[in-house]
Amino acid sequence: MDLYLQVSLASSKLLTKAYSTSFSLGIRTLDEKVHDPIYAIYGFVRLADEIVDTFHDQDKAALLQRFREDTYRAIEEKISLNPILHSFQWAVNKFG
């Protein structure tokens, strides 16, 4: 696993732990092989949820549209400079 993917997965794990301690604890009960993809998926969903629930002074529709486009591009190109999207595209391309 390359360094950028490791850092991206660590970012997803950090985001998950920061936003949901109970979810993070639940993941630990699962087989360790599935931890990274679960953190990657949760991190992705958390970003989308953050757009909807938090950025009230922003154009949420535009942010969601950009996030959608960035997500599809990351999956197609198998890379993103956004570490959360990079780990998500990895999970999609590896397990999807």
Locations of regions flagged by a protein language model:
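Acidic catalytic motifs of isoprenoid enzymes
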Residues: 1-96
